[in-house]
Amino acid sequence: MDIPSILSTCKPDLAPYESIYKDLHKHPGLSLQEYLAAETAAKGLRSLPGFDVRTNIGGTGLIGILKNGGDKTILLRADTDALPVEELTGLEYASKKREVDVEDGIEKPVMHACGHDMHVATMLAAAETLHKAKEHWKGTLVILFQPNEERAGGAKAMISDGLYDLSKHACPAPDVVLGQHVMWFEAGTVGTRVGSFASAADSFRVTVYGRGGHASQPHRTVDPVVMAAHIIVRLQTIVSREVDPREAAVVTVGSVQAGMTENIIAGEAVIKINVRTVTPETRTKVLAAIQRIVKAECEASGATKEPLWESTSSFPFTNNDKKTTETLSEAFLNVFGDKFDPETGPLGGSEDFPILATEAPNKSGGKGVPYCYWIFGGVDPEKWKDSVENGTDIPINHSAYFAPVIQPTMATGVDAMVVAALTFLK
């Protein structure tokens, strides 16, 4: 039986998975606090006879292993965490949740503003489809639900917790690792590309030190707010004046914090910086420029001591394996036709997904197996058409208004994941 026939025969009714999606969307969990998503994923996998489910890997991470003969192993990955965003979609199942973030102890609004709830529901439906289609494929299927993607810690944590240690979690090393992400493109579409597909990302918390005092006596202080302001403005020149225009890079200061009230000059300021780059050379150059600028501005301002640098996250480059991606693209083209784009432009965002492949043991005795990552659209086709024709705004990932239309988004995501799995297991 060919793959399109397997899809039409074995794909389950998606209504229960739509309900799962709505429940997860209404009750999200911040990074490191994805308890409902993990519970839901484990319950779904355990409902399918034959899956060996292992939980609490690197936090709330879990896997389901289905052995079905053969000698090939593939790993399918979905992420589970939400974001500190106050939802403004107006959906009947919108999140109203607030919770204390275990990272900093601050209470925050929580929203699935990046679609990871869709990833969980879609993966569970794909798992059921593949379970029903067991007679049509051979090999070992590993379904992995990963926490803490947004802060780039989940994949590393699962690896550090012995994900591929057979004696600990019984997870065999995969021959190929596959993953997908819902994005702000037309629902029903799928896209990927060979090679560079997502940028590297580096985030820092930088503390600069002045000398606090009374607001009426600035001459007796060293104002860290002014110091931070000079740093922020100067950082904007890195991309415009130091990066080759043929390259791509982004330097964003997403948070600045100093002082408690207007009549006191603070003693220090904290700047949170996020950097995106698409080549190792540019990454090295931009990070060096940031350090140079911060150090120089602190010295020029008379800082009382050297700035404190703290790395808060680091995402690798996502470089899709050529052979794997070309093989999968052929299969996607056969199923999705002109709704599939094999030359999708590089994503501005970043992923820790590749770590699950680059840290996997391979048959040569080293580390690193092939991987492919792709996207599927979540925007209502009519809204997409209106945006193309009239320029109306479409909320993007991480927006308080980001709300994938449930169908055909979910059906497309299920089909894509099943097609990918069967392509390497048939």
Language-model segments: residues:
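General structural feature for long, well-ordered alpha-helical segments within catalytic domains
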Residues: 2, 13-20, 33, 37-41, ...
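Histidine/acidic-residue-rich, glycine-tolerant segments that coordinate divalent metal ions
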Residues: 83-85, 94-111, 117-118, 129-252, ...
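Short Gly/Pro-enriched turn/cap motifs at secondary-structure boundaries
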Residues: 53-54, 149, 194-198, 344-348
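Divalent metal-coordination and catalytic microenvironments
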Residues: 24, 64, 76, 116, ...
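Acidic/His- and Gly-rich active-site-bordering loop/insert found
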Residues: 1-112, 117-125, 129-139
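Conserved hydrophobic/aromatic beta-strand scaffold that supports enzyme active sites
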Residues: 63-65, 205, 373
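Metal-dependent amide/peptide-bond hydrolase catalytic core
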Residues: 226-426
